[in-house]
Amino acid sequence: MSYTLPSLPYAYDALEPHFDKQTMEIHHTKHHQTYVNNANAALESLPEFANLPVEELITKLDQLPADKKTVLRNNAGGHANHSLFWKGLKKGTTLQGDLKAAIERDFGSVDNFKAEFEKAAASRFGSGWAWLVLKGDKLAVVSTANQDSPLMGEAISGASGFPILGLDVWEHAYYLKFQNRRPDYIKEFWNVVNWDEAAARFAAKK
C-alpha cells in the first residue's frame, strides 16, 4: 500500500479571506505531496510497515531500522499531521455539545483554552504544531517540533495524547499572506476551525 495525497473536502479558496487560496494550494499540492512521496520511498524496503495506516505507523517509530526512523518521523509525520489538518478546517461551524463542555471543564472557559492554544502556537520556536489533545479523560494543549505528532509519544515528540485539532505553524502555512505575523495567522485559525470534525474525533475517543 502506498500513501496518497488526500483530496481536500473543499476548494482552495473556500477558507478565504482567513486562509488564502495560493497558500492552501501550494501547501497541499507541494508540501504535503512531498511528505507523501518521501514516506513512500522510505517504505519501499519495509513491507512489514508499508501497509500500516500512517497514524499507526508513527506510533511504531522505535521499531523501525535506524536508517529509516528519522525520514519516516519527518515525512510520515508530515503526512499524518497534514491529513488531520485539512479535515480540521471549515468555515461556519460552532463549538458546542460535549466538546465545549469538556473544554470548559478542563480549561475553565473557552477563552482560557483559546489563550493557552494561541500561546503554544506562538511560542513554538521555528517550525512545528500546536494541538488540542485528549490525554486519558482530560483535554490538554501541547506543541510539537517539526512534523512530530503527539501520537509518537513523549519519548520522541515530547508530547502525548490523541489529537482533537491541530494548527500548523510552519512558515509555509502562512508566510505568503501573513509574512512574519504568526500571531495574526493564529487568530484567523479560529474562523476556520471545523468544530464538527473536532467533536467527532473527541466523541470517538472519550
Swiss-Prot record:
Entry annotated with the keyword Manganese: yes
Binding site for Mn(2+): H27, H82, D168, H172
Pfam families to which the protein is assigned, alphabetical: Sod_Fe_C, Sod_Fe_N
EC number of the protein: 1.15.1.1
Annotated GO MF terms: metal ion binding; superoxide dismutase activity
InterPro entries found in the cross-reference section: Mn/Fe_SOD, Mn/Fe_SOD_BS, Mn/Fe_SOD_C, Mn/Fe_SOD_N, Mn/Fe_SOD_N_sf, SOD_C_sf
Reaction(s) this enzyme catalyzes, per UniProt: 2 superoxide + 2 H(+) = H2O2 + O2
Gene Ontology cellular-component terms listed: cytoplasm
Superkingdom of this protein's organism: Bacteria
Keywords assigned by UniProt, alphabetized: Manganese, Metal-binding, Oxidoreductase
Gene3D superfamilies attached to this UniProt entry: Fe,Mn superoxide dismutase (SOD) domain, Iron/manganese superoxide dismutase, C-terminal domain
Cofactor note: Binds 1 Mn(2+) ion per subunit.
Entry cofactors: Mn(2+)
Subunit structure and binding partners: Homodimer.
Family named by the database record: Belongs to the iron/manganese superoxide dismutase family.
Job of this protein: Destroys superoxide anion radicals which are normally produced within the cells and which are toxic to biological systems.
Name of this chain's protein: Superoxide dismutase [Mn]
The organism of origin for this protein: Escherichia coli O157:H7
